Each structure stands twice: as C-alpha cells, then as structure tokens.
C-alpha cells in the first residue's frame, strides 16, 4: 500500500510519510521513563503529541507493560469519584487483555471496588497490579486536559501523587512512569485542600518534572521525510 500524508490523526510509519522521530523516542525513554519520571507533554495541537505517545508505546512494550488511555471521549467518567474509578478500571482492563496479561491478574483488576472509598480501592488495585504483573508499568493518558477543570480529575492526580511519594519512601508500589499529554500543562492546576479557606491551595502534580524536548521539525528533518 502506498504511503500518504496524514494531518488529521496519528501518523503510522508503515502507512504515512512522517519525520523519523526515533531519536526523540529514545531520549524520552532514557531521560524520563528509565529514570522513573512523571511528566506532562503539553504542546499546541498538530505538534505530534498523540503520534509521539503511539511510537513511544510501541517501543516501551518491549520491556514494560504500557497502559495507554485517552480522555478524548471520557466526559462521563468525571461525574463522581466512583464513575472515574470504574471507567479507569474498564479502560485499563482492556489494555491488560490486549497485552496478554495473565487472566488471574485481569480478574483481580476488574473485581468490584469499594462504593464508599473508590479512589482508595483504585489505589490498592494499582499497588497489587504493579507487584504481581512481573513488569514495570507505564501509564499514558492523552487528551488529559479535557477535564482539567474538574475536581474529580484533580483528586485522581492527588492519588497518583500520594502513591508516587509513598513509593519513593519504600512504602508502596506504583507506576514506573506517568505521562499526561494535552494542550495545557496540568502541572499548574491547583487542588483546594481546605474549601473553607480560599487561600490554601496545593498543586496535585508538583511531583512532575519539566519536559524539555523540542518537538518542532527542522528543514533537515523534513527533507529526510521526503527523500
């Protein structure tokens, strides 16, 4: 099948003309994933975020279990903490099946969560999966800013932050790396810790490192694509 240009979605190397970004993927893997970093890829649309995640996932699957999600059509997840937890369990369950994870682990992951404490229950599932699957796990979420103004989403970031900090202290097991991709930098979002006191805020994503990667293309890059 002849290759064609794609400007409307994910670029597939086997199907589309595209700049070779394998060097960029290698640098992300070495400088961020292997170092256990949590980070955000925030760039304007048409900058290749989704394609970068796709190609990064393909590379990482050689050594990691990759949970690749998108909040593109997940508005209904953000009605409550319970709906978010249930939605994530469904989506991650699909990732586990697609990557041929042991059926026993999938059944455990998909078991019912606590109705009263859905986020705590989700956190326990993450711990159990990370301890049992035999591979380090990378979580990727594209279009993450679709619900970035939602308190429910911020609570989920708070859960990831709590587990990351406990893991650093040797008290928990959690994802090797978390990548959030979107137009805006969710690192700047604020979680109100004390509703009765307007002045007290804290960032739920202050564990994230800055992502220093030029995602633009040079004339030489583009020339290589056309040759």
Task: Indicate where each model-derived feature is located.
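Conserved catalytic segments around the Walker B and adjacent sensor/switch elements
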Residues: 40, 60-77, 139
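An amphipathic alpha-helix signature
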Residues: 81-89, 93, 219-227
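The catalytic "switch" region of P-loop NTPases
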Residues: 9-12, 148-227
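Switch/connector loops and helix/strand junctions flanking conserved nucleotide-binding motifs
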Residues: 49, 75-79, 186-191
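Short, well-ordered alpha-helices that flank and scaffold nucleotide-derived cofactor binding pockets
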Residues: 55-58, 62, 162-165
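Surface-exposed alpha-helical interface segments used for non-catalytic interactions
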Residues: 26, 54, 86, 154-158, ...
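Walker A/P-loop-proximal flanking segment of P-loop NTPase domains
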Residues: 1-45, 49-59, 128-129
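Mid-core helix/loop region of P-loop NTP-binding domains shared across ATPases and GTPases
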Residues: 91-141, 145-161, 165-177
């Amino acid at each position: 099948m002849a290759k064609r240009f794609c400007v409307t979605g994910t670029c597939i190397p086997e199907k589309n003309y595209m700049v070779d970004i394998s060097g960029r993927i290698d640098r992300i893997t070495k400088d961020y994933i292997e170092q256990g970093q949590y980070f955000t890829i925030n760039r304007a649309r048409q900058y290749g975020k989704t394609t970068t995640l796709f190609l990064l996932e393909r590379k990482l699957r050689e050594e990691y279990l990759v949970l690749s999600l998108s909040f593109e059509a997940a508005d209904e997840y953000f009605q409550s903490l319970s709906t978010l937890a249930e939605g994530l369990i469904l989506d991650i369950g699909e990732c586990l099946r697609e990557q041929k994870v042991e059926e026993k682990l999938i059944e455990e992951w998909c078991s019912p969560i606590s109705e009263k404490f859905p986020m705590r229950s989700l956190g326990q599932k993450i711990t159990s999966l990370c301890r049992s699957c035999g591979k380090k796990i990378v979580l990727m979420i594209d279009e993450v800013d679709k619900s970035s103004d939602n308190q429910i989403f911020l609570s989920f970031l708070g859960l990831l932050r709590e587990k990351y900090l406990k893991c650093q202290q040797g008290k928990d097991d959690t994802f090797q790396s978390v990548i959030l991709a979107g137009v805006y930098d969710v690192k700047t979002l604020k979680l109100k810790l004390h509703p009765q006191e307007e002045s007290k805020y804290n960032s739920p994503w202050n564990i994230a490192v800055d992502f220093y990667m030029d995602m633009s293309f040079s004339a030489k890059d583009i020339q290589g694509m056309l040759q």
